[in-house]
Structures are given as C-alpha cells and as structure tokens.
Design a protein with these regions (language model features):
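Short, aromatic/basic amphipathic alpha-helical patches
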Residues: 78-89, 172
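Boundary-proximal intrinsically disordered activation/regulatory segments immediately upstream
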Residues: 2-75, 165
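RNA substrate-binding interface of SAM-dependent RNA methyltransferases
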Residues: 61, 121-172
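Short, structured interface segments
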Residues: 112-122
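Residue-level signal for inorganic ion chemistry
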Residues: 52, 115, 150
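Structural motif
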Residues: 49, 70, 114-116, 132-133, ...
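Glycine/charged-rich beta-loop-alpha catalytic/anionic-binding loops adjacent to active sites
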Residues: 39, 95-96, 127-132
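Glycine/small-residue-rich loop that forms an oxyanion/phosphate-binding "nest" at active or ligand-binding sites
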Residues: 93-109, 113
Length: 172
C-alpha cells in the first residue's frame, strides 16, 4: 500500500491530468509491469490488474471500481473505453503512449485499457455456502477454467491453497 501511494499519490493527482506516459523508465510503468508478472508483488501491494474493456465493464457492473485506469492514447476516443471512463468519473485516467501500452500488454496482438484493483479481502465463509476447493492446481490456465466453470454454475466461493497458481495472474 505504501508503495502504491508513493508511486501514484492521491487518487486525483493533478500531475496525471493531460499528460502522457511515454518512457518505460516511468515508475508507474515499472509498477504495472510488476503487477502483471509477479504474484508476490501483487500480494505485497494488495493489487491486481485487468486488461480489456470487457473485464473492466464486468467489474463496474459488479460495483467494483478500480484504483487507477491506464488508457492507451489511441483508445481515448473509443466508445467502449469512454463508457468505462464515464462509469469511473471520479478516477482520473492515466494516458499511455501506444508504444508503452504495447510493451506492457499481456495481449499477443494489440493492447487495451488497463485497470488496477485492490485485491479482495480474505473472509471466513459461512458453513452453509457452496464452494470449490483447489489444491495444488499449478497451471494458471486450469485455475482460470475452473473459476469460469464455478461462476457458470452459480458458485461464488472458490478457495485456493498456497500451492495453486495465482488467481490474479493475467494468464487466468
């Protein structure tokens, strides 16, 4: 959390307005790269990233707003991106040059809007709720498939032990 505040400052930092990140040495770019690639860094900072308009819109629809939003310069006039930004009007978007966005992106081709979210708090589940427990599922793709399947079945609680792949990896 302290690292997040040191990099980003307040939620409406005026230095973000009308500026574009164009250099890979920018601390915000380094922070994003680490969130994308390092599970330990995500846990320590209690944050994770999503990439893409549809993931962000799904989070917004579920009443989960991001801490920060990064928008590639070429997508500033995209209708879907503008819709997401309107839904998150209190969050000042940070503009990335397309070159920087491409270098950060987990997509094989292209790039999209990136949002930084706080990790949800771990909580004790009531005894009567259905849940799925994962033990030693080490492939992130398999974890993602199981998470999507449980959601499709209406199961809202999934427990992963420490030997499982990180559920907040971009590969899930």
């Amino acid at each position: 959390m302290a690292f997040f505040n040191r990099i980003f400052g307040s939620k409406t930092a005026s230095s973000d307005k009308n500026s574009q990140i164009t250099h890979s040495d920018n601390p915000k770019v380094k922070y994003l790269r680490q969130l994308f690639s390092q599970a330990k860094f995500r846990r320590e900072n209690k944050c994770f990233v999503t990439e893409g308009v549809h993931l962000l819109q799904t989070a917004i629809d579920a009443q989960r707003l991001p801490e920060k939003i990064f928008v590639p310069q070429s997508l500033l006039d995209n209708a879907e991106v503008l819709g997401c930004l309107k839904s998150c009007a209190n969050i000042q978007p940070i503009v990335l040059s397309d070159k920087i966005a491409q270098s950060i992106s987990s997509f094989k081709t292209g790039f999209s809007i990136i949002a930084v979210f706080r990790l949800p708090e771990n909580k004790v589940l009531p005894y009567c709720q259905d849940c799925v427990i994962l033990d030693n599922v080490q492939d992130a793709g398999n974890v993602g498939t199981i998470l999507r399947s449980t959601a499709a079945c209406g199961i809202k609680n999934v427990l992963l032990n420490k030997t499982c792949a990180d559920a907040f990896s971009s590969k899930v």
